[in-house]
Curated annotation (Swiss-Prot):
Gene Ontology cellular component annotations, sorted alphabetically: cytoplasm; nucleus; spindle pole body
Segment forming the signal sequence: none
Record keyword Transmembrane present: no
Places the protein is found: Nucleus; Cytoplasm, Cytoskeleton, Microtubule organizing center, Spindle pole body
Keywords attached to this entry: Cytoplasm, Cytoskeleton, Nucleus, Sporulation
Taxonomic lineage from the root: Eukaryota, Fungi, Dikarya, Ascomycota, Saccharomycotina
Residue ranges that the Swiss-Prot or TrEMBL entry lists as coiled coil: none
TM region positions: none
Name under which the protein is recorded: Prospore formation at selected spindle poles protein 1
UniProt-listed GO biological process terms: ascospore wall assembly
Its biological purpose: Involved in the pathway that organizes the shaping and sizing of the prospore membrane (PSM) during sporulation. Required to localize MPC54 to all four spindle pole bodies, and localize DON1 and SPO14 to four prospore membranes.
Domain of life according to the entry: Eukaryota
UniProt key word Cytoplasm: yes
Amino acid sequence: MNQGYTQLSAPELKETKTSKLNKMNNFRSSPIAEIINKIPPDCGKIQNTTFPEFNPALRRRQHEQWPAYEKPIRVTDSMSPQLSSINCLPNLYPHGTLPLPNPYLSYLNHIEKVNCQDVKFSNWSVLHNSNNGFEIPTYFSPRTTQNMPCSEKVESWLERLPIFVGFDGYLFTNCFDYEYMLDWEETEFTFEKTSCMETDYSKALTDTDIIYIQEKKIEALIRNQYLKEYEFSQKDF
C-alpha cells in the first residue's frame, strides 16, 4: 500500500480519491482549461513574444521609431540628485530612462485651449492699447444709451443733477446732507419751480464741478444707508 495513505482507513481513502476526481473534472469542464490549451508551447520564450517589455529587439526598434523630442534620456550620475535617484527604482524604470515632456507641444496645447474661449471676450482685453489695431466693441457701453456722443452724455448728466442756485450765483450743496431721506432728490423737485431754479446753470459748470457734485451725491446716499443699518451689540445676545 502507498505510504501516503497508511494513516487513512478504507472509507477515508475512497472519499479522498473521489474528491480528487471531482476537482479534476471541474477543472476540465471550466473555461480555464480551454484557455490554457490555446496558449502556444513557446509562449514563454523571449524571442517569440510580442511584448516590448520582454523583447529587447522589439524595444530597441520601437525606441528608434520615436520622435526626437519624445525619446527618453539616460539618467546618469552627472545629473541632478533628483533625477539620478530614479536609478534606484529598477522595478519601475529597469533601464534608467524617463520620458520628458516637450515644452513646445505644451505651449501649442495651451494656445489651443485659450482660443476656445468665448468669442465675445477672446479678441478684447483691458490691457490692449490703441496701437494694436483693436477697436472698442460695440457691446462695451458703460451707459444705458448705446453709442451716445460725449457732449450729449454731459448734457444728460446735467439735467439730472440736483443743483440749487442761490440769489448771489452760488451753488447750494447742502442738499447732499446725509440726514435727508433716500428720496430727497424727488422731494426737492416736487416743489413749484421758481425763477431761481429755472436758471440755465449747465453752461457755467466745469468738468470738476460735475465730478464733485456726483461724488457728493453718492457719498450722501451711502452715509444715509449706513445710518439706517442696524448694528448688533452685546445687549442683543
